[in-house]
Amino acid sequence: MCRVDRYTSRQVAKDCLPVCLFTCLPTLIRKHLLILTAYTLLALGMSWPLALNFATALPGVEGDAGSFVWALGWMKTALVDLRVNPFQSDYVFYPLGGATQLLWAVSLIAFISIPLQFLFGLIATYNVLYLAATVVTAWGTCLLAEEILSKSTVNGQRSTVQWNPLPPFQTFLLFKFITLHATRLTRPSRLAPLVAGLVFAFAPLRLGYGLSFFNLFNTQLIPLYALFLIRALRDHSRRNAVTAGILLGLNAYIDFQIAAFLVLFTGLYAAYQAIELAVTAAPSQPASARPGSVGGGKLAVVAAVSTAAMIALVSLAVVAPLLGMLAKDFAAEGGNYIRVFPISYSAERSYDLLSFCVPNARSTFFPGTPLKIAGVNAPAKPGDESARSPDHQAFVGYLALALAAYATVRQWKRARFWFFAATLFGLFALGPSLHIFGRDLNIPLPYLALHEIPIVNHIRIPMRYGIIVMLALAILAALAIYDLQKRITHHASRIPLYVLRFALFLLPFLILLEYAALPYPIQRVDIPRVYSDLARVPGDFTVLEIPTFNWRFAALTEMYQAIHGKRILRAYTNRIAPGVAEYFGTRGIPIVVRSLRVLEGAEKGELTADEIAEDKWARDEVVRFYDLRYAVVHPDLLKPAEATAIDAYLRDVLKAHVISDKGTAVAYAIPRAAAASDKVWIDLRENIGQMYAGRGWQFEYPQANWQGKFNYVWTRGAQSEIYFVADRAMARVMKFNARAESPQRVTVWLNDTRVGEITLTDVWQDRHVDLPAHALQAGMNRVRLEYGTALEETIGVTTITIE
């Protein structure tokens, strides 16, 4: 053989190696690899042009997306770099800190992202997980549909045959013919499960959640849980029950709302199974074994109950650590920020009945639909963008709706549960009363009952129940296609078979065409280099981000903390505790709260000369307390006049100077404060005194007054906090002037160490508490005054001294 021939042979063998390896894989693995590849390509297409900007842009619109990037990055920064608790930290809202509630929403996804961030970086990792959520959602729905179709009986008529003895050879031929025909009839459809995956994974509602709500977009465990739930209750399998319980518990680490939806879904499926068990009996079985009989029915019920109990126990065990963190947070914050919203709030965030069948405002295929409904797919008023918001993309698609209707009519026995699920969750999504064409008909709906169920009533937006509607419609679509394929095979003599099959082949593409919102919105993300520079600066200090009083801007700027790893003050979280919100939102703390609130335009007006003078006087005290070292201003997020005013303020008041100016991010270095004495003087009646007061204080305007002699500040709640900075850990004495309306016992804690107890009377006087050195720490310290019960306007305080 010549050299060229040898080279050609080696090259051909090398080129064919991937194909050979693929063909050597087991058939089942090859099948699922092909399915996953197809879904991946479709996910890239339906999110176009994200693939062209994979490392420099995020899918979605201005709003929450940046905060979810922070959640992923913060998990890595907290666990790997800082080695602090990512769920409870004072690296945000410093020094009060608190629960990083946003991280609860995607904690599982954030944990998975850690190794990917080392490989691809933060932005690309977010996009990888974004696409993976769609691919696995589609694949899981495909598996669920396959399970339902493969375990379903063939819907046909029973014929009567006169059986006469046949010779052995004829008997064998007849047996082979019957089994072959039965196999063809019961062969699971390949197209139907694939379409089911498309209907759920690429539904406009789910793609809408991808614009802002990364937690609700991560639906990949929903169909997998439904799959193992059905298997567990059908087969009474412990293994499937444990798997279902794990999946249900893990859903809570993605989003509590999804977990609640699945609990309701489980209740509906269990009720459906119980009713079916009660009314169905198998005539071919002995009476004692029939599901409807006394003996068989009891055994079946006991097995179903034990399976459901196992699912519940396993899921509780999985979610227990997260519930423990919730309980700890509720103890600190009171928990009232996770509250039940008024029914009127939910009514404004409910679907119109026509929302499901009217193309949404982001539709590519139906941009000029003549049917426009205010608040559904059209603005309710000039400038209103609510119709383009994530929750408003409820359109289920005409083809999916037609397939669901067909399955309900032609395959009622197999379709009825999914019809009930779609109907019930659709009714939940309509909210407390029925709306048609934007008009409230005042017809009460089942959501009113949900609003009375504890925990479930914390889901304040009824629209979000629509995600289960799409899952049910996906299964109904699969049942319809499965039935249509059978009927096409039977009636191939009337219409050419290839024409009908081609029509079915077009279905997935037509469905995707109805669902498409192309080009899919993306937002470019440029992480300023200065944040990488700040990450390399040694030490534990605070970076002042500007602006943050607008929640959208806070969601964006907090994303950068995952890069620099330093403390920040204001941040965005999906639920902010009242005490934290009051401290960083409405107090008169110089510079970082009152002044920036005005300079950023969050409060109308201008800083007065007296306020600027007060800021200059308090400058060192504020810088020292928060340990402010750098400020980063984003002029593109501010009005030109605001950016100019903030630049002048930072230079004049904080004596800051620019160290980096890249246009969209201007970084300032803030000179350190002069050394202070060991004595800390806190007058709660002064604006600067509010800086030291954490949770549990009632700052009023005008202030409370004692008999016209002096002002004072009330405590509020079951405990109050005081923060102070110590240069070194040495014993100190805390003295505070206070009185109580009635005798009150107060327990004093220093950094979670109990250091004393005092009793307050109705006489104003100084109380002394020793702060031992072993409980103190260099840097920030927290004193907690614990009252044993929630108080309001019972204890008054004027000044606090620590020396």
Question: In which residue ranges do the predicted regions lie?
Answer:
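Membrane-embedded helix bundles of polyisoprenyl
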Residues: 39-45, 129-148, 190-276, 311-315, ...
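Membrane-interface coil-to-helix junctions
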Residues: 42-137, 203-219, 345-387, 433-454
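Short hydrophobic alpha-helices at membrane interfaces in multi-pass membrane enzymes
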Residues: 161-162, 169, 188-191, 234-249, ...
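Perimembrane helix-loop-helix junctions
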Residues: 233, 262-314, 411, 487
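Membrane-interface helix-loop-helix junctions at transmembrane boundaries of multi-pass membrane enzymes
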Residues: 285, 289-308, 403-445, 492-493, ...
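Extracytoplasmic
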Residues: 341-344, 367, 374, 507-688
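Glycan-recognition and processing domains
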Residues: 674-731, 737-742, 788-803
